[in-house]
């Protein structure tokens, strides 16, 4: 296994994987290692913070990381922030009062399934030559100042 990389990213979740992809886009020759403590792929139903994106987050995923087609095909569109009120109808959400924009929001956003998104990001990272090391724990960091 290769032991020297230009960049080592600790954490193979949404932030680490998107950073690795953006760095590789900026410099295709850079060598990147992503270290993740999880034993393998993320579970498809990984309920995490960041599932409901705002427009700026979606812009980054769609335009900067070129995930537009993937998001449109595999993730749910989100039509702005919505609230469902009146708890008298707990069993049927369609009978609750809904508060939110009446028109389609001009800038798209998505309700993300983080597990499937992170697995897609990992797949794209590997395809670009980014090494992902699963089931790893960082206990010490040595910085080579000569590089």
Question: Language model features by range: what are they?
Answer:
Residues 15, 19, 40:
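Conserved Rossmann-like nucleotide-cofactor binding loop
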Residues 56, 102-123:
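Short beta-strand to alpha-helix junction loop
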Residues 1-15, 33:
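Beta1/beta-strand and adjacent pyrophosphate-binding region of the FAD-binding site
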Residues 134-147:
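A conserved short coil-to-beta-strand element within the FAD-binding core of flavoproteins
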Residues 42-91:
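N-terminal FAD cofactor-binding segment of flavoenzymes
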Residues 8, 24-49:
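Glycine-rich FAD pyrophosphate-binding loop
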Residues 12-14, 37, 114:
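Glycine-rich Rossmann-fold phosphate-binding loop(s) that bind the pyrophosphate
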């Amino acid at each position: 296994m290769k032991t020297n990389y230009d960049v080592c990213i600790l954490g193979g979740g949404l932030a680490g994987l998107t950073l690795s992809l953006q760095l590789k886009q900026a410099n295709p020759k850079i060598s990147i290692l992503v270290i993740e403590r999880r034993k393998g792929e993320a579970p498809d139903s990984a309920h995490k913070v960041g599932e409901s994106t705002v427009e700026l987050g979606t812009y980054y995923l769609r335009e900067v990381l070129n995930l537009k087609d993937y998001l449109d095909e595999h993730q749910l569109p989100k039509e702005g922030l919505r609230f469902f009120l009146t708890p008298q109808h707990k069993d049927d959400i369609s009978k609750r009062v809904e508060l939110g924009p009446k028109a389609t929001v001009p800038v798209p956003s998505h309700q993300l399934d983080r597990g499937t998104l992170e697995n897609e990001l990992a797949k794209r990272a590997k395809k670009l030559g980014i090494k992902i090391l699963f089931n790893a724990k960082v206990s010490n960091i040595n910085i080579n100042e000569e590089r």
